[in-house]
């Protein structure tokens, strides 16, 4: 499989020029548009469709900081994250996860919008700090530690989604 960075002819780096990424995405999608292959043979149409899918997958990877970091780790180690087998070994973070889940549950039960807003801000701040730490680990080529940050960020992303769901339920009342 081709590197998402190579597909867009971008340097392998955690910080990606999003404007340049969008520009190159549009150019690739335009060149692979089905209208360009109307008179082409079936095999050529199929190849264009596969390339278009590859471009879309690469875009998704490069737009998401966690997926982007995992791509960098995979390129440098030859190993991909096995999400089914992953669980963080950081006991302190596991305890923090339990506390956050309990806090969110209590906020939802109490229907306290101010507490939810405050909690969401704390999670957002934690996520931002962890992204900064992840970038530092990637720059220092500390692949195992960077992978652990990816795991933690995946949890925080899921927690942020759960916060949004609680927010929606609170505002429905």
Task: Cite the ranges covered by each PLM segment.
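C-terminal accessory/regulatory regions appended to core domains
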Residues: 1-173
């Amino acid at each position: 499989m081709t590197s998402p960075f190579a597909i867009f002819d971008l340097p392998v780096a955690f910080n990606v020029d999003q404007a340049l990424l969008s520009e190159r995405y549009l150019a690739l999608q335009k060149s692979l548009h089905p209208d360009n292959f109307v008179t082409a043979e079936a095999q050529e149409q199929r190849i264009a469709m596969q390339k278009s899918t590859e471009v879309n997958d690469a875009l998704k990877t490069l737009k998401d900081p966690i997926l982007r970091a995992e791509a960098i780790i995979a390129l440098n180690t030859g190993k991909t994250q096995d999400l089914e087998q992953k669980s963080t070994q950081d006991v302190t973070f596991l305890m923090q996860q339990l506390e956050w889940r309990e806090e969110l549950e209590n906020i939802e039960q109490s229907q306290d919008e101010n507490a939810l807003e405050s909690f969401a801000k704390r999670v957002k701040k934690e996520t931002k700090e962890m992204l900064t730490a992840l970038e530092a680990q990637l720059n220092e080529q500390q692949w195992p530690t960077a992978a652990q940050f990816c795991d933690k960020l995946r949890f925080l992303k899921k927690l942020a989604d759960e916060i949004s769901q609680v927010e929606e339920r609170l505002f429905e009342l």
